[in-house]
């Protein structure tokens, strides 16, 4: 998923953190510059929120809005705001009240999404389908206040042969899809008009056609035989077994890392899940699978961030690695690597490098490949390419036009290429690229 699903209640005027407000540019990972005061405060407050501890950050009046922008970019604003409400109310009462209204809106929307989703899941089960919930609501239950960890969508995994049945149930309940040919894509999005509910119905956990990570599906070929049942607000739901689910959370973050990055919330999900179910997880299997796709150092860095920055103890068979390059990339990426257009555009370089390595080609793709990437590499930015690769020239044209429109200032045209090269070096640093 690469979309921003921001919704407000009807008539809600509150928006202290507009999405168009860019985060400050971060120095790239080779610089080893120390984190800013705001970034340090953000991690300290997030840690306090996760462990229900007190947070007393020393921030100036100018730094409070910056903190909230950073929290919003990672979609953890309710968690951050609640942890520091007394301090921000004293420092800037107007900002505190405006933020409180926005957070209340987010929490109400999440409560509505959760209730509607549980009803939908029950309807699918009653119809004879065998859906599995992944991520989303399963991870939210691990937080001190689940509805303060928002999910813009819910993901459901089904056997491909059950798609027609599930589609029938969902359309009967008022959900609609914009996918022109849902039979041909691995993931079908659904919305219910005048509702915050958004569903992604997966036939596979990863797009099989992707040259960079389509092969990750092999780890979950028999996952339907290892499911577990959870109770959420009185509703029974089925999900992946604990080992499979943690592996999926890690590889889902890894997939986004190969694109344009991922945010701190995904790291929190991984850490909370791994500690909640540590005794039931087959750690040797997790490490073996990660190593098979050269993601073992990446996974180790994720867990090291938890130990050194978020107050978690060691878990699993991971050795300490230098986590700071990954943490710097995470903080500047936003929730799904969508902090800025340069970062989104740069994903074509990193994806091409990984695909080339898996296919035995050189990983140093040239300018031609960067300008005219494959359909698979562009599907994140252009969802309408899924199953319709004949539209690739249109995507190329739109992409080039966007570059020309966005890069009118002198020296800015190479920003995405430069960032792509830097992130390719980051993948090499963690052993993903040779």
Indicate residue ranges for each PLM-predicted region.
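Low-complexity proline/serine/threonine-rich segments in eukaryotic and viral proteins
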Residues: 1-31, 97
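Conserved NTP-donor binding/palm subdomain of two-metal-ion nucleotidyltransferases/polymerases, i.e.
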Residues: 34-152, 158-434
């Amino acid at each position: 998923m690469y979309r921003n699903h921001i919704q407000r209640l009807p008539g809600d005027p509150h928006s202290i953190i507009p999405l168009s407000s860019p985060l400050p540019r971060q120095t790239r990972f080779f610089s080893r510059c120390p984190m800013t005061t705001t970034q340090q405060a953000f991690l300290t407050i997030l840690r306090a929120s996760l462990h229900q501890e007190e947070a007393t950050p020393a921030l100036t009046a100018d730094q409070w809005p910056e903190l909230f922008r950073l929290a919003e970019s990672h979609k953890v604003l309710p968690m951050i705001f609640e942890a520091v409400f007394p301090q921000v109310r004293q420092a800037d009462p107007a900002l505190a009240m405006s933020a409180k209204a926005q957070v209340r809106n987010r929490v109400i929307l999440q409560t509505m999404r959760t209730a509607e989703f549980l009803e939908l899941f029950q309807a699918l089960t009653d119809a004879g389908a065998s859906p599995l919930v992944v991520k989303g609501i399963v991870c939210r239950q691990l937080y001190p206040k689940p509805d303060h960890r928002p999910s813009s969508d819910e993901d459901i995994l089904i056997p491909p042969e059950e798609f027609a049945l599930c589609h029938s149930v969902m359309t009967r309940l008022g959900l609609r899809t914009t996918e022109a040919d849902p039979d041909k894509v691995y993931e079908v999005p659904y919305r219910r008009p005048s509702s915050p509910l958004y569903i992604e119905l997966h036939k596979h956990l990863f797009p099989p056609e992707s040259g960079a990570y389509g092969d990750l599906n092999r780890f979950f070929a028999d996952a339907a035989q290892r499911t577990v049942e959870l109770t959420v607000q009185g509703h029974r739901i089925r999900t992946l077994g604990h080992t499979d689910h943690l592996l999926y959370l890690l590889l889902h973050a890894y997939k986004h890392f190969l694109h344009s990055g991922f945010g701190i919330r995904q790291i929190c999900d991984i850490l909370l899940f791994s500690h909640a179910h540590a005794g039931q997880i087959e750690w040797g299997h997790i490490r073996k699978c990660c190593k098979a796709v050269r993601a073992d150092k990446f996974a180790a860095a994720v867990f090291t961030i938890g130990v050194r920055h978020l107050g978690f103890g060691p878990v699993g068979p991971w050795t300490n690695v230098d986590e700071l390059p990954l943490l710097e990339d995470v903080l500047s990426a936003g929730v799904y690597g969508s902090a800025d257009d340069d970062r989104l555009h740069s994903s074509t370089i990193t994806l091409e490098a990984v695909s080339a390595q898996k296919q035995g080609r050189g990983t140093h793709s040239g300018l031609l490949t960067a300008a005219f990437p494959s359909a698979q590499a562009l599907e994140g930015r252009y969802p309408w390419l899924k199953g319709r690769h004949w539209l690739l020239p249109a995507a190329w044209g739109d992409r080039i036009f966007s570059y020309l429109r966005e890069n009118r200032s002198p020296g800015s045209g190479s920003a995405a290429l430069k960032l792509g090269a830097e992130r390719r070096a980051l993948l090499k640093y963690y052993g993903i690229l040779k």
